[in-house]
Regions:
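Extended catalytic cores of very large enzyme megasubunits
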Residues: 2-15, 20-475, 488
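Short, structured beta-strand/loop micro-motifs enriched in basic residues and often containing a Trp
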Residues: 473-483
Length: 488
């Protein structure tokens, strides 16, 4: 806690520590300093150059006012009240960059009073970033390239080619970079970049948002400076942005820029399951999202010839994938891993699958950090519409159902049904309502339609499509020679 005291001329400032909205106290307008309320000793702040200075209410107020009024539009906020809230939370030798962060947080908390507080929060936090980082793109890239780890070994954070281009074309890059565009970001957008996207040395952020945009453009286009400039101009003015893996990894020694990977379960065996798990872990390490289909994994209770035992089914296996998604997060702690698991509704473990994300039930049968999706054949929806029976099969006893679609799937399904190979028979509509119940409670499973996806595929010669990726959106568009069209 800081007490605001001083000498010279008094002005009325609202007392934010008192109950009510119209109570005012007299404080000094100039040379206002902080005192420790217990020892009555003067409070100091720690400047960015390492020196100490007596805490001054006026200097904080002047800085905040300048950010609110020197750039248009001028902001409609109560600067004195804001700074009083901040000063009330200061402690001795608090660094100035922490004061900026605290002030921005206070502004963000007042957005519901006036939107201008959000704008001021953005200006403060971006200004703070500029004061803490270098204004030279080339020098920043040089620091990242010459980084040494805790053992003193050279451990470059960017690729050598990117570093060489940044040094060779330093004047060009400095001429196109526009740091004022950092102020186009709102407070929460900047904090997201600061937390996970801007490159750090240790725990210290060394990039500005503009450095990141230019690094991404350089990582994509390399020595093609015209394309680098064009891409930077568009990204920095918010015409578009690249996906997270590109922002994380462009220009680095591991330029993995793809967002989504579609993976098949290698085979229904210990080796196949854990080889697939290893692939998922490696992809997640470099920020890739994963769509994995598990149609070929045998259902619970199915006999295992090698051990003369029975399978535990999908649920325990998916808990292992869930734990991997949590442990092997994206970019080393920057973002949680994301796996979407696809299953066809004829699989005998479908009912347990629908419960995996629910908030109640047996914890040993839950894997709530995964996303779930159904790869639905038209035959199932026809059975739902007619309120007919639906057979559930084990892929080990009834192979091939995931490898065909349309009429071929219908024929194989009917063959297995007539042979009495179903593990269980349920009402299709009852299963459908269980699907809807899970959606209402958890938001999943996503519903995609197997026959339609395969009928519309331009790569039917390559085989049957068995899943989609992590992200499913109905408004997805495809590019044709006549422009973009929504998938229908």
């Amino acid at each position: 806690m800081a007490n605001v005291v001083g000498t010279n001329t008094c002005v009325a400032v609202q007392d934010t520590n008192l109950v009510g909205t119209n109570t005012y106290v007299a404080v000094q307008e100039t040379n206002i300093v902080g005192q420790d309320p217990i020892t009555n000793e003067e409070l100091y702040i720690l400047k960015r150059d390492g020196s100490k200075e007596i805490l001054s209410f006026d200097k904080i107020l002047k800085r905040v006012k300048a950010l609110g009024t020197e750039t248009k539009p001028h902001l409609n906020v109560n600067y004195s009240q804001l700074v009083m809230k901040v000063v009330d939370q200061l402690y001795n030798t608090m660094p100035t960059y922490v004061i900026d962060e605290l002030t921005a947080e206070q502004c963000a908390s007042l957005i519901t009073k006036h939107l201008d507080y959000g704008t001021l929060a953005s200006r403060i936090i971006v200004s703070n970033n500029h004061k803490n980082t270098l204004a030279s793109f080339a020098v920043t890239m040089d620091k990242l390239y010459h980084f040494k780890d805790i053992h003193g070994l050279h451990s470059p954070l960017i690729h050598k080619d990117v570093w060489e281009l940044s040094q060779k074309n330093a004047a060009f890059f400095q001429s196109i970079i526009d740091y004022s565009r950092d102020y186009l970001l709102d407070y929460f957008g900047f904090k997201t970049l600061e937390r996970a996207y801007l490159m750090k040395i240790g725990k210290k952020v060394v990039e500005r948002p503009q450095h990141m945009w230019l690094r991404v453009a350089l990582g994509i286009h390399g020595a093609d400076l015209e394309r680098v400039s064009e891409t930077y101009e568009l990204i920095s003015q918010k015409y578009f942005t690249h996906a997270t893996p590109t922002l994380f990894n462009a220009g680095t020694n591991h330029p993995q820029l793809s967002s989504c990977y579609l993976i098949a379960m290698e085979e229904d065996s210990v080796d196949g399951i854990y080889n697939t798990l290893k692939d998922c872990a490696k992809i997640s390490k470099w920020a890739g999202g994963i769509g994995l289909h598990v149609h070929n994994v045998r259902a619970a209770g199915t006999h295992i010839n090698g051990t003369n035992g029975v399978s535990n089914g999908l649920s325990p296996m998916l808990r292992v994938f869930n734990t991997t998604a949590r442990y092997i997060d994206q970019g080393g702690g920057r973002r949680a891993g994301s796996f979407a698991i696809y299953l066809e509704p004829w699989h005998a473990d479908i009912e347990a699958f629908l419960d995996m994300k629910k908030n109640h039930g047996d914890e040993e049968m839950r894997a709530r950090d995964l996303f779930y999706s159904l790869w639905i054949p038209d035959l199932f929806m026809e059975k739902v519409k007619k309120d007919e029976d639906w057979c559930l099969f084990c892929p080990h006893k009834c192979p091939g159902l995931a490898d065909c679609y349309g009429a071929a799937f219908n024929a194989l399904y009917e063959k297995y049904r007539l042979e009495g190979k179903a593990n269980k028979t349920v009402k299709a509509r009852t299963l459908w309502f269980k699907i809807l119940d899970s959606q209402m409670e958890t938001g999943t499973p996503y519903l995609l339609y197997k026959d339609q996806a395969n009928k519309k595929s331009n790569q039917q010669n390559l085989g049957v499509i068995k899943s989609s990726n992590l992200c499913v959106a109905p408004e997805t568009q495809i590019l044709t020679d006549q422009g973009y069209f929504e998938i229908k």
